[in-house]
Design a protein with these regions (language model features):
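Conserved "landmark" site that anchors the functional core of diverse proteins
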Residues: 1-282
Length: 282
């Protein structure tokens, strides 16, 4: 059983929970950018939450079913169709052999997640089926004609739908300051937590780059490379913040002013959206 790719869209990847715990080998975590969407799609189709799904940026993905399949589309909000008929996202969808599932351009959010009963089962690499865009590790991005093999169903479908959780294009996320907030002036900390930050168009799975006031350092010089995690807010030498995504390097030399708590929310920001940081206590 499989789904065949007719059109891959701008970028569609296979993703699961990723490769946590391999930083000592120089391997980043990768995995689905929007973990909530991963879990929701898998719950809808009766899979364990960590089964591999498709993560599609923007619109344009089209796949045809080569056999009957149960699928679910979560994450972004926008037009979804089966054989040209509009259908709802966040719900269980039944595909017959020959049916074409097509995703339009999102009206809210950035990344679609497509789950299928049984999960997608390309050959895992280091325990995961995720593609790491920085390391080029894992199953390659989708291309026209690819056959996406699907595993056997895990169990009966128990949910019909899940509630949407995306809001307007002004995202508030919690941030815990540190570990290098002492490298910045008090004014820079105030600026980080009080100003809206605009998402730069060059943002990707490696990092969400933000435009806004420059953050002034209290300490000059270079920081020795040290471990970083997803959600780390690195401040570049120019004073611009970058929030690291799932495909981040395992170490970095820019000081980390804080760490974002809700990293899933940043999976769905679009170029030009505003991000606001709110302080959380450890």
């Amino acid at each position: 059983m499989s789904l065949r790719v007719l059109e891959p869209g701008p970028l569609t990847l296979v993703q699961d929970r990723g490769r946590p715990g391999l930083a000592d080998l120089g391997v980043g975590p990768s995995g689905a950018f929007d973990q909530r969407a991963l879990h929701a799609a898998n719950r809808l189709v009766g899979n364990p939450e960590g089964c591999a799904v498709l993560e599609a940026v923007g619109g344009g993905l089209a796949v045809v079913a080569t056999a009957p399949h149960v699928v679910a589309v979560t994450g972004a909000v926008g037009p979804v169709s089966v054989d040209g008929r509009p259908v709802a996202s966040g719900r269980v969808l039944s595909l017959r052999r020959g049916d074409v599932l097509r995703l339009g351009a999102p009206t809210v959010g950035m990344r679609w997640t497509v789950g299928v009963g049984g999960g997608f089962v390309p050959e895992p690499v280091l325990g995961s089926r995720s593609f790491d865009t920085m390391a080029a590790l894992g199953p390659a991005p989708l291309s026209p004609g690819d056959e996406l093999v699907v595993g056997p169903p895990h169990g009966a479908v128990s949910l019909e739908s899940v509630p949407a959780y995306l809001a307007a294009a002004d995202v508030g996320v919690g941030v815990v300051l540190g570990p290098r907030d002492d490298w910045f002036t008090p004014a820079a900390i105030t600026t980080l937590l009080s100003c809206p930050w605009r998402v730069d168009p060059v943002s990707d799975r490696i990092g969400v780059r933000l435009e806004g006031p420059l953050l002034e350092r209290a300490r000059l010089g270079e920081l020795e490379s040290e471990p970083v995690v997803r959600g780390s807010i690195q401040v570049t030498s120019s004073g611009r913040p970058v929030v690291l995504g799932p495909d981040h390097p395992v170490t970095g030399g820019y000081p980390v002013i804080g760490v974002v708590v809700d990293t899933d929310a940043l999976a769905q920001v679009r170029p030009g959206d505003l991000v606001r940081f709110h302080r959380r206590r450890p």
